Amino acid sequence: MKPTHSPKTYRVKSFGCQMNVYDGERMAEMLDEKGIEPAPEGEDADLVVLNTCHIREKAVDKVYSDIGRLTKGKTQTKAPMIAVAGCVAQAEGEEIMARAPAVSMVVGPQAYHRLPGMIDAAVAGKRSTDTDMPADAKFAALPKRRKSAPSAFLTIQEGCDKFCTYCVVPYTRGAEISRPFSALIDEAKKLVEAGAKEITLLGQNVSAWTGEDAKGRALGMAGLIRELAKDPDLKRVRYTTSHPADMDDELIATHGEVEKLMPYLHLPVQSGNDRVLKAMNRSHTAESYLRLLERFRAARPDLALSGDFIVGFPGETEAEFEDTLKIVDEVRYAQAYSFKYSPRPGTPAATMERQVPKEVMDERLQRLQAALNRDQAAFNAGSVGRTCEVLVERTGKHPGQWLGKSPWLQSVWFDGDVAIGDLVQVELVEAGPNSLAGQLLETVAA
């Protein structure tokens, strides 16, 4: 490629999980420090970072679609500088560089702290790829947090050692690593100083976090949550995503004892059938999962539950799928996420026999989503008449309207004289399938 001008504006487009949202925010902070400004809404950017997800095949296809859209009908001098980051970059970096000559750089999720130097190389006319996995070095090199939304993400752990047979995460994010306790306390403090009232702890397997406090005492995630909750200016703590194998007694107790830990738990089960769970290498049964949920509900009776499901895993029969519907009927999730199985190259499940036909997966997904939507609507309807604290996150669709989140992660719309970042008391007066309408009562904290 030829040398080009230094970009003056940027846009980061993140796909997929909350971890990618966090990574996208950190990349934006690095670009800010480099003197590159966010492109105004509706205007083309000089630099576009596609922060990609590799969980599903459609997400990979979308990357190439976006590259084509960004370059269509444009000469090299008019087209933006393109960086592909994230898990697709990690898994398919060489193919991207070969297939998409318009891409200037490919950077994996554990190497994006080197993005500023790669931009300099692109300006000099050099394409580059960096998919190393030094996650600890990445966090040490990132800039300090200087701005925050009322609800902020904090990555405490990366990677996964579970090796579910359908999942690419161990190959794209690497082995489990935990960030040091002191670094997390410092970053959380910076987020709160920058305006965060709520922090969501993130990890591919967040409850696997381990560390030592300032006195050298061993801690799990429950201990970290208890320490974070001591900050009087931090009002709420959440975490996602967990594996049932790493939910210990202390974490269960923390849900009942730490008021700032919100009454919401996202705990994927994936299937309600034990044979399928074993083929997935999930290391739990449907029964052990249900008993675990019972313990969480005993500790925090108002707990809202969320989960993940995969339909059409190789070999799944109709009877096995119906076991998934049974577990949905028993748990009654407040919200959940469901997907058709998507074979990912390099995973054991991709080469398993008895791949389920697409039309069967489509029909099963439709039935599962109908059950999950029914339960979410019922949970929201059951909230009507309740008074709760809502964190104001953004303006609504008309003047004076606001959107915030309840403790149970429900979207709540209401009118009133408030500001983004306020904690307010709201009476929930009307339920929709995906949100609730509320009546403002009072402001708790500004």
Swiss-Prot record:
This protein's GO cellular component annotations are: cytosol
Disulfide linkages recorded for this protein, renumbered to the chain, are: none
List its EC numbers.
Answer: 2.8.4.3
The UniProt record lists the MTTase N-terminal domain at 8-124
List residues of the TRAM domain. Answer: 381-442
* Catalyzed reaction equations: N(6)-dimethylallyladenosine(37) in tRNA + (sulfur carrier)-SH + AH2 + 2 S-adenosyl-L-methionine = 2-methylsulfanyl-N(6)-dimethylallyladenosine(37) in tRNA + (sulfur carrier)-H + 5'-deoxyadenosine + L-methionine + A + S-adenosyl-L-homocysteine + 2 H(+)
Q: Where in the cell is it found?
A: Cytoplasm
What this protein needs as a cofactor is: [4Fe-4S] cluster
Keywords for this entry? 4Fe-4S, Cytoplasm, Iron, Iron-sulfur, Metal-binding, S-adenosyl-L-methionine, Transferase, tRNA processing
Chief place where the protein resides: cytoplasm
Detail which positions bind [4Fe-4S] cluster 2: 160, 164, 167
Q: Cross-referenced InterPro entries, in alphabetical order?
A: Elp3/MiaA/NifB-like_rSAM, Methylthiotransferase, Methylthiotransferase_CS, Methylthiotransferase_N, Methylthiotransferase_N_sf, MiaB_methiolase, rSAM, rSAM_horseshoe
Output the Gene Ontology terms for molecular function.
4 iron, 4 sulfur cluster binding; metal ion binding; N6-isopentenyladenosine methylthiotransferase activity
Residue ranges of domain Radical SAM core in the record: 146-378
Alphabetized NCBIfam families for the sequence: miaB-methiolase (TIGR01574), MiaB/RimO family radical SAM methylthiotransferase (TIGR00089)
Q: How does it assemble?
A: Monomer.
HAMAP family under this entry?
A: tRNA_metthiotr_MiaB
Family membership: Belongs to the methylthiotransferase family. MiaB subfamily.
Q: Would you tell me the protein name for this molecule?
A: tRNA-2-methylthio-N(6)-dimethylallyladenosine synthase
Species annotation: Erythrobacter litoralis (strain HTCC2594)
Q: Lineage of the native species? A: Bacteria, Pseudomonadati, Pseudomonadota, Alphaproteobacteria, Sphingomonadales
| Gene assigned in the entry | miaB
